[in-house]
Amino acid sequence: MKDSFLFPIVFMLIMVLIFAGILSIAFRTSESKIEAHRQNTYQKRILSTLSAKIAETTGSKADKILAQYPESYEKYVYKINNKNLGRNAYRAVVADSTVAFCFEIGGKGLWGTMQALVSTSTDFRTILDFAIVEQQETPGLGARIEEEWFLAQFRNRLFVTEPDAPGDVTRKYEFIAETQEPENDGQLKRVTGAT
């Protein structure tokens, strides 16, 4: 039988079935852990975008609020159930008062879609923080959008200039090369390959 031309085919088929079965069992047994980890990571990102405002309001420190996850998430963060928004939205509540909002945003990158979280002040005029949830950019270049220097430049940025004015009231920013230094508050550094 070993000299038969069918032996390698049957052997490979049996090996494929065995290893596919092992892989399927491993996936099914770890699926709930993977989903729980994904959910925890997402909630921590939401909390991180809201933690500075929560800390400012409570007199605590943002690091302490983050360290107390999941209790701090359950205490301060509430999902906004509004189907008209068309996206996930959350609010930070301290002493029965909303102190900030967090919205999920998305768009196209060079290699795939991206998801991010942006937190705003309650009047929606200021971007408080920004965090990348998911991106599929090149690890050496485009994925640099997750680096602290890039994310930090969006913190506490004015988003709406004159809310009562007619027409477009959003603040315009100019994107400059990463190697340049911003000359004014209206310039943000960009990463080539991550738009």
Where do the protein language model's features map onto the residues?
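Flexible, solvent-exposed loop/hinge segments and secondary-structure transition points
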Residues: 1-195
